[in-house]
Amino acid sequence: MMFRTLDDANVQSKRVLVRVDLNVPMANGEVTDLTRIERIVPTIAELSRKGAKVILLAHFGRPKGVASDENSLKHVVKPLSKVLDHSVHFAEDCIGDKAKAAVDALKDGDVLLLENTRFHKGEEKNDPEFVQALAANGDLYVNDAFSAAHRAHASTEGLAHVLPAFAGRAMQAELEALEKGLGNPARPVVAIVGGAKVSTKLDLLSNLIEKVDALVIGGGMANTFLAAKGLDVGKSLCEHELASTAREIMAKAETTKCAIILPVDAVVGWHFAADTPHQTYGVDSVPGDAMILDAGELSTDLIASAIDDAATLVWNGPLGAFELRPFDTATVKVARHVAKRTKEGKLVSVGGGGDTVAALNHAGVADDFTYISTAGGAFLEWMEGKPLPGVDVLKK
C-alpha cells in the first residue's frame, strides 16, 4: 500500500491540522496511561521542528455533541506538554471564533490543542459544513490516529477530501507493520485468536482462514469449537448456539488449507477466581461440574511448535482467563516464546486489541514484539479485511 507521509509534505510556516488519538484513560481528571500520548510525540515534534504551526484535533469519550468538563481535552494539556517537552496552547473550541483566534496567534513551531471534536454533532456525522469549519484553520492535514481510522468522521476522513492529506509517523508505523503482518507477509503465517466469545469475532475468523496457514483458537472461544466437535466442556463459557457456525468455519478452513489448532488439554477450575483449586484434563475428559480456564501444557507446546514453523505471527486475544492467576500460564508462556523467536530474528510478530496489549504487558514482552497496535476497533477491522476510511483517503 502506497500512502503519502510527512516526507512528501512542505510544512514550513503552514497551519497543519493533525488528527491524533488522545482518548487516554483518566481517573479524577488525571491521565493514568501515557502510551497514546507517547505514540504521537514523533509527529508533533517533527512538525514543530520543521517550523509548522501544529494544530491538534482529537476526540475524548462519547459526549454525543454536548460539551462537558469531564470530556474536555483541557485535562490532557499538562501531560501532553510534559511528554512532548514543549508548551501546548489550548483553545476552548475546535471551530469558530475561539479556534480562529488561537490559530491566528500561533508562531512557527508552536503547538495548539483544539477542544474535543465530538462536542459538535457534525464530527460523527462527517457533516460537510463542519468539515469546512475545521479546514478553515488549516493548510495541510495529517492523520496520526490509526485507532480512529475505521470511522468515517469529519476529523478522520472528511478533512482529507478538502486539504492535502498525509500520514503521520505513528500512522505510518502502524500501516507498515500491518502490511508485514497480513498485507504481504513472509510465510508461513500463524494467527492466534483468543478471548471470550466467537460471536464477536466471526468476521475475523472467516477472513483469517483465507489468509493464514495456521489458526490457533484459544480462550473461551475454543470451548465453542470443542463443543461443536461433540466434546463436553462442562460448565465452561461456551456459545452452544454457534456450534454449527464453528463447524462451518472448520470446514471452510479445510478447503483453504488453513490448519486450525485447538487445545488438546485444559486447566479446569470449579470457581471463576484466582488461585481456585485446579487440575489439567484432556479436552475429551473435562468434568461436567468444572470450567475450562486455560490451555494446558500439551496445548502450549503444540502452539509453540506452530510458532517455530512460522515466519509471521498475528495475535489477537488471550489464551485463557489471564487476569486470574494461575490461568495466565498459557498466555504468558506462548507470549514469551513469540518474543524469543522475534528477538532471534526468526519471526515478525504483530499483536493488537485491548486485552491482547494488557496480556502481553502482563507477560512482560510487549516491547519485544515487532509491533503492538494500541488500536482496538481499527486493528480488529483491519484483521477482518474491512476497508478503513481514514486510511483509504491517504493512499497515493
Curated annotation (Swiss-Prot):
What are its GO cellular component terms?
cytosol
Pfam families given in the database record: PGK
On the tree of life, the source organism's domain of life is Bacteria
Q: Which residues bind ATP?
A: 201, 323, 353-356
Tell me which EC number(s) this protein carries: 2.7.2.3
Q: What is its pathway?
A: Carbohydrate degradation; glycolysis; pyruvate from D-glyceraldehyde 3-phosphate: step 2/5
GO BP, sorted A to Z: gluconeogenesis; glycolytic process
User: Gene3D superfamilies, alphabetically?
Assistant: Phosphoglycerate kinase, N-terminal domain (3.40.50.1260)
Report the catalytic activity: (2R)-3-phosphoglycerate + ATP = (2R)-3-phospho-glyceroyl phosphate + ADP
Q: Which UniProt keywords apply?
A: ATP-binding, Cytoplasm, Glycolysis, Kinase, Nucleotide-binding, Transferase
Record-listed substrate binding positions: 21-23, 36, 59-62, 118, 151
What family does this belong to?
Answer: Belongs to the phosphoglycerate kinase family.
| Name of the featured protein | Phosphoglycerate kinase
Q: Which organism is it from?
A: Brucella abortus biovar 1 (strain 9-941)
**Gene for this protein?**
pgk
